[in-house]
Amino acid sequence: MNKDINIAAIIKNEIENFEGKIQNHDIGKVIIVGDGVALVSGIEKVKFGELVEFENNVLGIALNLEQDLIGVVIMASENSVFQGSIVRRTKSVISITVGDQLLGRVVNALGIPIDGKAELDNSLKSAIFTNAPSIMDRKSVDRGLKTGILAIDSLVPIGKGQRELIIGDRQTGKTTIAIDAILNQKGKDVYCVYVAIGQKNSSVAQIVSLLEKKGALEYTTVILAGASELSPLQYLAPYSGAAIAEYWMNKKKDVLIIYDDLSKHAIAYRTLSLLLRRPPGREAFPGDIFYQHSYLLERSAQLSNDKGGGSITALPIIETQAGDISAYIPTNVISITDGQIFLRDSLFNSGQKPAIDIGLSVSRVGSAAQTNLMKWASSSLKLNLAQYNELKAFAQFGSDLGPSSQLILDRGNKIYEILKQENQYPLTERQQIMLLILIRENLIDSLEQKSIPLFKSAFLKYCDSEPKFRDKIEKMDYNRVLEPNNLAGILKDITDFIEKFNLGNVF
């Protein structure tokens, strides 16, 4: 009897203390699924870019919001989602793990490690889609980001916070320039993010191996959305990279981000848009493709001192077809960025590496990103090359040239030899200035064109190894133009070296 009373009392107590918690879930149902896209009905309050969850824990992103249907891109194999599947709102936007733990790591577009190393701590996350800094949160670009490539640092200088497009046909050295820029940031307190979109996994593996070998992976994060990945992941990859870079920028750091390449990103977005039944426009791209790229690239900025002074420098890459820079995507990105480095395949095939077309390449930041000494040393370079290219085109008609015209042609050929540079061998600013002084003061006129590569190698060794000459170079103030007395002393040493070289006394 006592047992019955105790049981009844326990039940009564449980009923009295019961607190019914009602959980509301916005759910819908998959109407159509195919090609990585699901059309869902029943979820009315979902937001653009919000994560939704299917029955088997597969996630999707709501990218199309219509009156009765929602277009969701599936972040997994489409075979895992079926018609009639239940879909639930998560009420959260897609985010990615950020922080210093990502340095030296290779992750996919969702921030999941794919390098076989330790798992990441997911406690620190940032939304992939965020607004770019406002005008009042920025300041003008006035600090240079050195690539170590003489032709770029002297003719099309890049500043911290700038967006400089690298554009050209396939196999013209676009990725090589970007990777060399990463290698040159070693010891400069610049974090790097390399975003590979639609690239072959084997090519990215070689890049990761090179970065590791050169000691650059320790300050670099690689995000891979390879050619075999789903279109949604290729679409998300650059925004994920921007979110990772923004975390460091807001921590007062300088960041360099490479988007390799935005042509494949545009194709991935076109694929998604057509599957979502959006109306196609020029070249079948959706109407908002310009917005997608401008929204991405505007997130690169030089923050004001009040916001910490951090920066993101973006080097987007665009692949052209047969050198056509007037196509839709190239013209879009050219108009968004602060200049472009145009690579021409004819120059590349003739042995001019990097194959930069000086006439079509420009930096809209310009000399604001250079030190005063570099401005002075490179001031006559573009004029010399412009005169050379003009005369070269004229000389093709077989016209007889006078001595002064022939001198300009010979000098131009020698300048291009000086500008040739092997990849993975960046030059310091001091080395670049010494080579530019050779050009500025016309000291290369006494050299034969075929001997320039050997001379350049010997001269750079001389600059580093000759104690007295090295002391003069090290005393140069980058913020000031060379004093006449100092310049005269340096020119005398260089002239003596050239005389020895021409006599065969330098090896």
UniProtKB/Swiss-Prot annotation:
Record Pfam families: ATP-synt_ab (PF00006), ATP-synt_ab_C (PF00306), ATP-synt_ab_N (PF02874)
Known role: Produces ATP from ADP in the presence of a proton gradient across the membrane. The alpha chain is a regulatory subunit.
Gene Ontology molecular function: ADP binding; ATP binding; proton-transporting ATP synthase activity, rotational mechanism
Quaternary structure, from the entry: F-type ATPases have 2 components, CF(1) - the catalytic core - and CF(0) - the membrane proton channel. CF(1) has five subunits: alpha(3), beta(3), gamma(1), delta(1), epsilon(1). CF(0) has three main subunits: a(1), b(2) and c(9-12). The alpha and beta chains form an alternating ring which encloses part of the gamma chain. CF(1) is attached to CF(0) by a central stalk formed by the gamma and epsilon chains, while a peripheral stalk is formed by the delta and b chains.
Entry keyword annotation includes Translocase: yes
Keywords from the named record: ATP synthesis, ATP-binding, Cell membrane, CF(1), Hydrogen ion transport, Ion transport, Membrane, Nucleotide-binding, Translocase, Transport
CDD domains: ATP-synt_F1_alpha_C, ATP-synt_F1_alpha_N, F1-ATPase_alpha_CD
Binding positions (ATP): G168, D169, R170, Q171, T172, G173, K174, T175
Gene3D superfamilies reported in the protein's UniProt record: 2.40.30.20, ATP synthase alpha/beta chain, C-terminal domain, P-loop containing nucleotide triphosphate hydrolases
UniProt keyword Nucleus, yes or no: no
Entry GO CC: plasma membrane; proton-transporting ATP synthase complex
Family membership: Belongs to the ATPase alpha/beta chains family.
Residues annotated as transmembrane: none
Compartments, as annotated in UniProt: Cell membrane
Protein name listed in UniProt: ATP synthase subunit alpha
Source organism phylogeny: Bacteria, Bacillati, Mycoplasmatota, Mycoplasmoidales, Metamycoplasmataceae
Membrane topology (UniProt): Peripheral membrane protein
Catalytic activity field: ATP + H2O + 4 H(+)(in) = ADP + phosphate + 5 H(+)(out)
Main location: membrane
Residues annotated as site: Required for activity: S361
Entry's EC annotation: 7.1.2.2
